[in-house]
Amino acid sequence: MGDWSFLGRLLENAQEHSTVIGKVWLTVLFIFRILVLGAAAEEVWGDEQSDFTCNTQQPGCENVCYDRAFPISHVRFWVLQIIFVSTPTLIYLGHVLHLVRMEEKRKEREEEPPKAAGPEGHQDPAPVRDDRGKVRIAGALLRTYVFNIIFKTLFEVGFIAGQYFLYGFQLKPLYRCDRWPCPNTVDCFISRPTEKTIFILFMLAVACVSLLLNVLEIYHLGWKKLKQGMTSPFRPDTPGSRAGSVKPVGGSPLLLPPNSAPPAVTIGFPPYYAPSASSLGQASAPGYPEPPPPAALPGTPGTPGGGGNQGLRARAQNWANREAEPQTSSRKASPPAPTPPAAESPGGGPQQSLPEGAAGSSGDSDGEGAVTAVELHAPPEPPADPGRSSKASKSSGGRARAGDLAI
């Protein structure tokens, strides 16, 4: 049989990167399969076809009976079994060597002087080896190792079933054959049937032990990962996980995590304007002047405290001064301009310009708006009518009128 040294060296390298049960499995494969098969099985099955004899002189009958009794030699069958069962382990070893080589290249690139700045955000993969220098069985390597065990188990089961259907688990000394070109049923005899039966049972037991080790290794890996998941600390509460807990699903309402404060709702209010109280205690909303006074109907009696025409002129003058208030405030903000000549009032008398002390501006502390309060007085009557001027002077004295409006 061929040399097993090359396969043995490969499997020895794979043993360094296996679990404890995997190392036991490889030991069983080395000692109880490869060594026993190379040392003893060839000696037992070396004279298999030469010592297979049949009680006939028909040419070719003995060969066809041997082919029917042993479709494939036991030794070659076990060699194929060893190769197929070892192939998943060799694939796993290739994956390990690939990862180790990639890590070595990465270290070489890190030792080289940096060249042009590459794209940022590149994260280096996790190191393949741990602190003790052993290869970590995790991630993609763990998946490869699990598939390695699964395929080894399937190959073991397949070869055990194939051996049973081809030969059975026992060789009988007598084999009856009626295959053409034998003239009739002939008796054929197998050499050393008891010794061969012992070898068959031994190799079957080794295959069952390997199958049991594969099952235990799968259980060991599953229990180990489950234990790590139970004993590992909880993941930190990241902003992404917090945002994912509030994300609506399928248009359903937001689901807040337990023990969380209700979301804050901001309600907007219109700006608050402080009312400006006049000297008579009356209040009016700033920025909303009263409508102009209605026109006096003929025959309507005048307001008390003065003639009817005098009251109408005073109210009209108040309204005109209110309309001119925005212009007055804009002139205060601009540089002083020459004072225009006094305009005539509707009553025929010159209208005096408002003194600076007559208008005061009061602004809100928050800067929301400015309110200007203006006190307006009726102009004096011409001296032609002494009775009317006395009444006007009495009504337009230093005190405020009832019809005046503070803005």
Swiss-Prot record:
GO molecular function: gap junction channel activity; gap junction hemi-channel activity
Regions crossing the membrane: 20-40, 72-92, 149-169, 198-218
Intramembrane residue stretches from the record: 2-15
GO biological process, one term: cell-cell signaling
Keywords: Cell junction, Cell membrane, Disulfide bond, Gap junction, Membrane, Phosphoprotein, Transmembrane, Transmembrane helix
UniProt-listed Pfam families: Connexin
Composition bias type Low complexity, residue spans: 356-370, 387-399
Membrane side Extracellular: residue ranges: 41-71, 170-197
Post-translational modification: Phosphorylated on multiple threonine and serine residues. Phosphorylation may have a role in assembling connexins into connexons and gap junctional plaques, as well as channel gating.
One GO CC term, this protein: connexin complex
Region Disordered, residue ranges: 108-130, 233-257, 279-407
Keyword Glycoprotein carried by entry: no
Functional description taken from the UniProt entry: Structural component of lens fiber gap junctions. Gap junctions are dodecameric channels that connect the cytoplasm of adjoining cells. They are formed by the docking of two hexameric hemichannels, one from each cell membrane. Small molecules and ions diffuse from one cell to a neighboring cell via the central pore.
Family: Belongs to the connexin family. Alpha-type (group II) subfamily.
This protein's name: Gap junction alpha-3 protein
Organism expressing this protein natively: Bos taurus
Gene: GJA3
